[in-house]
Amino acid sequence: MSEKRELVLKAFRGESVDRVPVGFWHHFTTEDEWLHGFENPEIIDKNKAGHKKFIEEVKPDFVKLMSDGFFAYPQPAFKDFKSISDLQTIEPLGANHPWISAQVDLVKSLIADFPEDIVAIYNIFAPVTYLKWLVGKVSGGDDLIADYIVENRKALKHVLDVIGEDIASLSQRVIEEAGTDGIYLSVQSIQDERVSAEIYKEIIAPSELKVLEAANGAKGHNILHICGYEGARNNIELFKDYPAQVVNWAVGPEGISLAKGLNIFRGRTVLGGFENGKDGLLYTGTKKAIQEKVREIIADTGTHGLIIGADCTIPSDINYERIEWVREAAIL
């Protein structure tokens, strides 16, 4: 086992380390390409090339493998439905559907190209996110999910459970067949006041838990990402019992430090600390300021159960030297 692999897995388990691991990642394609890779191999090739360059230049402690191009869940019934009630009889695509198999092939290809042995976690979205993106064109759709709940919550739950079964199959296959170490499951509260915590737990959470349970069943080392994309705010308490080894959220916008998160998530490993946007310290700050922030995070959170990273994906044009500054300051 390589030193980096041993270091990261120790941190995932909350064990003692001699250096706090660091994990940052970004997209390798543009937002208008995220939904269209399944039918456009050029997008997948672009994603592969981006991973290769990133891993060679950053030499990361571990990597999140990006699912760019596969954001569109290819359920034919989603193309032209008038009401959520129209979808009450849909069935899963199946574990061997080409959309799933193509992602297994992607992960195999990416890992085969690694220049060293590092932990790799594959990006997976919550079932409701796949639905939301299709109806809301990537950013948006929360109001439509709330509309569906008002219209026919039983039908929506069925749809999410069906998607969840396929995403569970995808998670299992990328771990067991493709060789990734686990999944990075991205969840997000519905940004509509009509969707209470109770409704979320009843209608949406079961499909998310199905995915995590499948990944755990495949012996994955899994990260739960509570996504603050484009300013989304989350009810962190909704996710405190989700069975992931590592948890990541937007510490600034949510007003919950990593140290507080250790308590909320009952001592499970926490990941983050830096704002991810172009206005944040990681992107704009001096080496001194960035390294002072690293030491502050470590002093506040402790060295057990900590991985330093960002709220979400960082800008794709960031100077990779900045990531190395973080790693230098994380040596204990």
PLM features: what roles do these ranges have?
Residues 25-32, 61-94, 98:
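Alpha/beta catalytic barrel-like cores
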Residues 1-29, 36-37, 50, 61, ...:
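Active-site loop segments of alpha/beta catalytic cores
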Residues 33-58:
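Active-site-flanking structural segment that lines cofactor/substrate pockets
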